[in-house]
Amino acid sequence: MILSKDIKLLPGSKVEVVIRVSKNVIQEKYNSLLQDYSSRLKIQGFRIGKVPINVIENKYSEGLKATVLEEVINNSFKEFFKEESKIPLSYATPTVKEKNLKLNLDKDFEFTFTYETYPEFKIPSFDEIDIKVEIPEVFIDDSDIDDEIKNLQIENSIIIEDEEGVVKEDSIVKVDFVELDDLSNEIVSTKRQGFVFTVGKSETYYDFDKDVIGMRINEERVIEKSYIADYKFEELAGSSRKLKIKIKSIKKRDLPLIDDEFAQDISDKYNTLDDLKNFIRSSLLNIVEEKKETLKLNKFFSTISEKLEIDIPHSMIEAEIEIAFKDAKRQNKNNMSLEEFKSIFYSSGYIGGDNLKDEILGNLKSKLIMQKMVDLDPIKVTESDVEDEMARQSKNLGVSYEEIKKFYEDQNLISYLKDDIKRERAKKKILENLKEVKGKKLNFRDFVNYKICE
């Protein structure tokens, strides 16, 4: 159907295509549609199938041409992308440039459309790169194990009334509070009732948890708070507020004893407290190894990204911004709208001290590099590879192999699983080709927060 096509690559991994369709094809489709109308159209004064062609054209010509135009464009898209290697991104629909296109049955039809495609770039071979990554020497001591035990102790505690009736560190307190104006009148919009928090452990909006220590049930207190210029909540930063707080209830955690019985209550796979501690130590060691692997991969991707010029399409950046926005929302890291989030990205790029733009573009480049490595992997994923991966997931998740297999087949996700297997291959290859340099000694807690760029 396509008589000719002219393809031009534009900045931003955008493709511009000029398509020409023969007038013979246009006329054939128009005449076919005209005959179809003629065979079933009902017009007053004529029998069905007997309406003269000229009458139909006089009445419906523009509508017929519009129908043919839509069909020609859609069929041109199908034919073009059936042969073209540069396909559109799934979230970037091809756009026809011309407005108000019309058919002229006596001329070849030409139209232009643009679309964004996957960016083209070449990854340097491992022979061309020499990446050294400094990995800290991590030690896990008894205090790290004790911290995890204490967390389990808190998780398995019960909340009871505090018979002393006095607020102290770690008390679980229910309060009513409200802001007061300069005349000590309540500002109704700030009133909150039944607010529950743990003293010294929770981040309250007004940061008053220390101010209620020593208060008793039903006691009311007016306090004044001054907030520093870079206070965590911008609305309060650099201001002073007067608050009226009333204690409604005071509770505490009844913590179980840490002994063999405690370990057995956590899981029947532990017979003694030492069994539980050994499991925790093993889990922390796994966390350390996973973190080390992440640091190495981050170093690889950041180094390769610096060497590459990747012309990332706008729609791909937009999609990555939305992913970052949803992640931040899920982690309660921002209360902005998507539009505000995008505005910051395209302007300063900073939220607080974090460079949002660098983080999002860095993550996106890492994904592109990894996908390129997956696409270039010449080794096919075999059925045996798929079965082994399903068996591994079955063991880790504690569900049957048949359930895992049924899930992937029912959700039509086998191809995604194969890509995941290739990604793991790529990660393994990266890790094998990095040179690890022993770094400074760090305890477990510091290492968990360690960044490769520090």
Swiss-Prot record:
UniProt protein name: Trigger factor
Highest rank taxon of the organism: Bacteria
Role, per record: Involved in protein export. Acts as a chaperone by maintaining the newly synthesized protein in an open conformation. Functions as a peptidyl-prolyl cis-trans isomerase.
Keyword Glycoprotein (UniProt): no
Homology family: Belongs to the FKBP-type PPIase family. Tig subfamily.
Pfam families according to UniProt: Trigger_C, Trigger_N
Domain notes for this protein: Consists of 3 domains; the N-terminus binds the ribosome, the middle domain has PPIase activity, while the C-terminus has intrinsic chaperone activity on its own.
HAMAP family reported in the protein's UniProt record: Trigger_factor_Tig (MF_00303)
Positions of the PPIase FKBP-type domain: 170-256
GO biological process, one term: 'de novo' cotranslational protein folding
Gene Ontology cellular-component terms listed: cytoplasm
Species of the source: Borreliella burgdorferi (strain ATCC 35210 / DSM 4680 / CIP 102532 / B31) (Borrelia burgdorferi)
GO molecular function terms attached to this record: peptidyl-prolyl cis-trans isomerase activity; protein folding chaperone; ribosome binding
InterPro entries registered for this protein in UniProt: PPIase_dom_sf, Trig_fac, Trigger_fac_C, Trigger_fac_C_sf, Trigger_fac_ribosome-bd_bac, Trigger_fac_ribosome-bd_sf, Trigger_fact/SurA_dom_sf
Disulfides per UniProt: none
Enzyme Commission designation: 5.2.1.8
Family annotation (NCBIfam families): tig
Keywords for this protein: Cell cycle, Cell division, Chaperone, Cytoplasm, Isomerase, Rotamase
Keyword Nucleus found: no
